[in-house]
Amino acid sequence: MTFDGAIGIDLGTTYSCVGVWQNERVDIIANDQGNRTTPSYVAFTDSERLIGDAAKNQVAMNPHNTVFDAKRLIGRKFNDSVVQSDMKHWPFKVTTKGDDKPMIAVQYRGEEKTFTPEEISSMVLLKMKETAEAYLGKQVKKAVVTVPAYFNDSQRQATKDAGTIAGLEVLRIINEPTRAIAYGLDKGDDGKERNVLIFDLGGGTFDVSLLTIDGGIFEVKATNGDTHLGGEDFDNRLVTFFTEEFKRKNKGKNLASSHRALRGLRTACERAKRTLSSATQATIEIDALFENVDFQATITRARFEELCGDLFRSTIQPVERVLQDAKMDKRSVHDVVLVGGSTRIPKVQSLVSDFFGGKELNKSINPDEAVAYGAAVQAFILTGGKSKQTEGLLLLDVTPLTLGIETAGGVMTALIKRNTTIPTKKSQIFSTYADNQPGVHIQVFEGERAMTKDCHLLGTFDLSGIPPAPRGVPQIEVTFDLDANGILNVSAEEKGTGKRNQITITNDKGRLSKDEIERMVNDAMKYEADDRAQRDRVEAKNGLENYAYSMKNTLGDSNVSGKLDDSDKATLNKEIDVTLEWLSSNQEATKEEYEHKQKELESVCNPIMTKMYQSMGGAGGGMPGGMPDMSGMSGGAGPAGGASSGPKVEEVD
């Protein structure tokens, strides 16, 4: 059965979250581990692929093949200075095939595989989709996915592609300030217009948005931020600090050469950082961190604030910029709402509060779940959902960066200015630069600088077939059409001849082609099938193990063993021991082999147990002494110590 609504997914740098609107409210859905946020981690091993908590839990043992931070790579080029700088901190390998697209290389099932950041993100999205499906009991096809407000066009497109690869129809890519909906619905409507500043500092990105909330209308006035600032950067500072501390305490031993040691240290640093939000000092203790040397060190909150001081202070500039862009004085801001796990850091809170003259900050919404909450509300509205609470609700979003084309001399001529409400459409007339020019080469840029060389090239196209004419005579109308996803279509028309050409900005260099997306969708299905096969294999193995051990326990029960012939008892014990021995030396056997082995064991056990049972004059019902009911024990065999329809307990490796 398919769910007729849509889910809201917050695809985060470090953690992701999923929500759905049901019964007049948003439910944030817990994953299979009972956690309401899921680590954005994917791990590859010799036998399986792990996503979420399972991936993060084994990272110290498998650092080279555990991928995280895909959001810091998505929509970027390999040679981007940001990517090059991040690569120094990542234990996994990032390469390129010469086209400047970053590729992540891992060992999976004994061979090297490469994945695009979109594919890794799609695996996290798939996990969120499965989490929602387990909760709803229905198949989910549609979703709204959030991105930082300051994401550029190629990063948005790449995120949308990731959704497609995960088998989702992405109804809308929305900016994370949509979390304001969570705040707005929480506050209720008091009939007054309120200016609200959303300050969102997460695991890897930072956004500031200024909104006016009036009734159900949420109008984004301005947005700013840094797509590369968050909790991970604070962790990096701590890792560097403790690496030096370790070197100082241990005669120059440099643990930076060991990815495993670094990973263990990073996990401890993340924990220490969280501790420092509520305590004034934190201690890290790691046994055998590097070259069998134990490490213990303490850090105070004051030292942490000094280490990250410049990063904390850098969050204020975007706040100043949004106020400037919205032409608003900071005294006119009614509420400052904190979102994102990193806003729990006391120094960040005091900096923001001081900037607003000691204003009390609003912490009423859960910083980890607010984005998914807003996305779930949007998903409900976009699939035609009707509710008293969402009636009249309208989110007017804006484009974060100026969009324009290059004109003579490399000048950036803006058509859509930053912080313009979207969707929007703007046209402007241009002409030729030389006499008898047969065509024009239109280059589309994104950015705030006066010259295009300092802006980001989105795409190019040609308009040819212009009739010969003196320069400045032909009239070429260029139209920019920016949709609600923040994705751009550009067209150009020569007014005299009606010749027309257009481009959907797909940033060909950084963007996946249709064929690549199709290939990745098929790969994703294959990996999903592999995961399913692995689950079935483990279930068959557990089924055999449970059956063998429950038989062994039954034979150990005096009520049963006393009623069996010695020869039958010896036969059963021998057969069970042979099976258990086979199991211990065939941990990687196929599902069919486990099932076959179980049938073999059943063919010996069932007749003997049935004979004993009949000699006792019993018929129907379960066996005495905790003996499982054999009638349910066919083929893929059930759980131990009960009928095969009972609950299954997974073995934890």
UniProtKB/Swiss-Prot annotation:
PROSITE patterns: HSP70_1, HSP70_2, HSP70_3. PANTHER family: HEAT SHOCK PROTEIN 70KDA. The lineage of its organism: Eukaryota, Discoba, Euglenozoa, Kinetoplastea, Metakinetoplastina. The keyword ATP-binding applies. Belongs to the heat shock protein 70 family. Residues 616-653 are annotated as: Disordered. This is Heat shock 70 kDa protein. Keywords: ATP-binding, Nucleotide-binding, Stress response. Residues 633-644 have a biased composition (Gly residues). GO terms for molecular function: ATP binding; ATP-dependent protein folding chaperone. It comes from Leishmania donovani. It comes from the Eukaryota. Pfam families: HSP70.
